[in-house]
Amino acid sequence: MGRYSGKTCRLLFMLVLTAAFFVAELVSGYLGNSIALLSDSFNMLSDLISLCVGLGSGYIARRGPRGSSATYGYVRAEVVGALSNAVFLTALCFTIFVEAVLRLARPERIDDPELVLIVGALGLAVNVVGLLIFQDCGACFSRCTRGRRTRPSQQPSQGDPRGALGCPQEAATATAPGSGTAVTLRGSSAGRKQQEGATVFSNVAGDSLNTENEPEETTKKEKKSEALNIRGVLLHVMGDALGSVVVVITAIIFYVQPLRREDPCNWQCYIDPSLTVVMVIIILSSAFPLIKETAVILLQMVPKGVNMEELMSQLSTVPGISSVHEVHIWELISGKIIATLHIKHQKGTEYQDASRKIREIFHHAGIHNVTIQFETLDLKEALEQKDFLLTCSAPCITQSCAKKLCCPPGTLPLALVNGCAEHNGRSSRESYRSIEAPEVAIDVDGCPREQGQTLSKTQERQHYENSTHF
């Protein structure tokens, strides 16, 4: 289709058709004195705006990253567009609801039901065409997404598997999803201790596990990626179709049983605003889930279907791991989940095997973009050593910037927050003191005392880090 894809041509076709019927319904609504037709015309206006947002956000999302300002590209543009469409439709529904309530208080008749019926029927036909078009777009998108997932991905070349953040003579290469740009991290000081550094394993370009049944596992485990942008546009078209149904029903009633000018308003005058209120409720019941889903993505919350407690329990069974901290799981877009975590790894054990087992755990949970930072822990050192505190070995350089960290010191361990019982021979309630680390007083009154998770009431000050130790 030339410079435009089939999806873009359909959006442009609906844009022109919707603009024409918006003008027609607006004029007919004022001439026929129909609140349903007027509300339906403004639904058409919302469709125009949603189509423009859908076209713009889709174009931006397809653009590749230009320069280093957008390391993830612009794939979230469609998420922002879907949220904008849903919020705008919600605000429009509130306005229509207020107008319908006022019309219930002061009912009015439809002056020209024949004109309203004709325009409403044509608007319903346009909306049915739009529903068929965008349902087809959603089906095509789902097929294309499944096709991309089943293609074998090219594995990046691997050199030295160990990377470093502040670790001498080590490097790690990471590829940002959606960008294809490799970033190499190199250490700068040769005099630092090995345990003060951190080894980074980045798998953000894709899962490098050579699993033979990956397509089947992906179909079963992975969350189906949905076109949020198309859902936002489809939601507007569905709401407009419901409005057209209300217009047609009201016009048919007044056309079959017309009211004379001298007759007072009866039950027929309440049909129009009553059905409008029902239409608003139906639209809002579909708009709120879309707002919630897009807001969860933009707030980088843990995606639905990911059980943090189960993941932590499985991570605790990996040999050689002493603690897990700085665990973050979020969605870049719908269906593409990213996880980052810090691992306290016991010195002398094989961390490559631990890395593979950790990535297998996330792989079976449907998380394939995993970044692991390993931190060495020497169990032979004294208990008062800093590295045995099970805190992060690569914090901020100075204590003044500790509050700017995503998990600042003094927060409760993940095991205390989610009540997850850990294994590997250590209690999740164990803690270690340090002169260098700040202390935080924790009130233990009212804490649950089951599964062995009890604290002494005489313990007044205790330092906890946002880590889970095993």
Curated annotation (Swiss-Prot):
In terms of SUPFAM superfamilies, this protein maps to: Cation efflux protein transmembrane domain-like
Region annotation Disordered: where it falls in the sequence: 146-223, 451-470
Question: Where is the segment annotated Required for plasma membrane localization?
Answer: 300-470
Write down the position(s) of the site called Important for coupling of manganese to calcium transport.
Answer: N43
Membrane topology is: Multi-pass membrane protein
* Signal peptide positions on this chain: none
| Cell compartments where the protein resides | Cell membrane; Golgi apparatus membrane; Recycling endosome membrane; Early endosome membrane
Listed Basic and acidic residues bias regions: 458-470
Give an example GO biological process. zinc ion import into organelle
Q: Which residue ranges does the entry give as Cytoplasmic-facing topology?
A: 1-10, 56-81, 135-233, 292-470
- Superkingdom is Eukaryota
The UniProt transmembrane annotation reads 11-31, 35-55, 82-102, 114-134, 234-254, 271-291
Which reaction(s) are listed as its catalytic activity?
Mn(2+)(out) + Ca(2+)(in) = Mn(2+)(in) + Ca(2+)(out); Zn(2+)(in) = Zn(2+)(out)
Q: Which residues lie on this side of the membrane: Extracellular?
A: 32-34, 103-113, 255-270
Q: In which tissues is it expressed?
A: Specifically expressed in fetal liver and fetal brain.
Say what happens when this gene is deleted. Answer: Homozygous knockout mice lacking Slc30a10 are born at expected Mendelian ratios and do not display overt phenotype until postnatal day 16 to 18. After weaning they fail to gain weight, are smaller, and die prematurely. Manganese levels are elevated in the tested tissues including brain, liver, blood and thyroid and manganese toxicity induces an hypothyroidism phenotype.
Assembly behavior: Forms homodimers. Forms heterodimers and high-molecular weight oligomers with SLC30A3, SLC30A2 and SLC30A4; heterodimerization is mediated by covalent-bound tyrosine residues, occurs probably in a tissue-specific manner and could mediate the intracellular zinc transport activity into early endosomes and recycling endosomes.
Primary role: Calcium:manganese antiporter of the plasma membrane mediating the efflux of intracellular manganese coupled to an active extracellular calcium exchange. Required for intracellular manganese homeostasis, an essential cation for the function of several enzymes, including some crucially important for the metabolism of neurotransmitters and other neuronal metabolic pathways. Manganese can also be cytotoxic and induce oxidative stress, mitochondrial dysfunction and apoptosis.
**Family from the record:** Belongs to the cation diffusion facilitator (CDF) transporter (TC 2.A.4) family. SLC30A subfamily.
Identification of the protein by name: Calcium/manganese antiporter SLC30A10
Q: What is the lineage of its organism?
A: Eukaryota, Metazoa, Chordata, Craniata, Vertebrata
